[in-house]
Amino acid sequence: YRAVDSADELRAACEELGYPAMLKARMGGYDGRGNVPVESKADAEDALDAVAGPAMVESFVDYAREVSVIAVKGATDEATGETDDDSVESGETEVATFPVGENVHREEILRETIVPTRSSETAQERAQEVALDVLDVMDGRGVYGIEFFETRDGEIQLNEIAPRPHNSGHWTIEGA
């Protein structure tokens, strides 16, 4: 991936990364908004106009499905050592993840999350492992929506980290 601020930078990055590529707004993108496919050099100006600001361009991933893990990171109070969970020692970080969900989009908007995903057990385990790795390197506490692409050969690739309650975690009481 590369940061780009001009059509010339976008064209140069796409020459290096290959076409097609995906241009993503650095700020304000949500639920597919701010994402524009770049099929050729001729698309550079229009693609940048569409994202309306600084962007990232990345290699296009031909994925089988998008999956996500809702993950939560908390900690004991550093000043008092208090926690809501007696099983957590003072100063330790508490983490939890929910089952891997499969996200179904229509017109770039998430319309349905299938839990558990139809992914292989190996792919689900890998998504959970990477989600825990993400929590390990993030300084913030709270709920994270961590999205992945699952490629056609079952590889898991990190797509997005949303440091907030994520719409793929808006389950019904029957689904929880």
What is the meaning of each model-derived region?
Residues Y1-N35:
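A conserved helix-loop-beta module that forms one wall/lid of the active-site cleft
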Residues E9, D43, R126, V130:
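Charged catalytic carboxylate motif
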Residues A12-A13, A47-A50:
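CheY-like receiver
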Residues P37, K41-D43:
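Rossmann-fold NAD(P)-binding glycine/threonine-rich loop
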Residues A50-S119, Q124-L158, A162-H170:
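Phosphate-binding core of ATP-grasp and ATP-grasp-like enzymes
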Residues I173:
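Active-site lid/adjacent beta-loop-alpha segment flanking the redox-cofactor pocket in flavoenzymes
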Residues A176:
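Flexible glycine-rich active-site/ligand-binding loops centered on an Asp-His dyad
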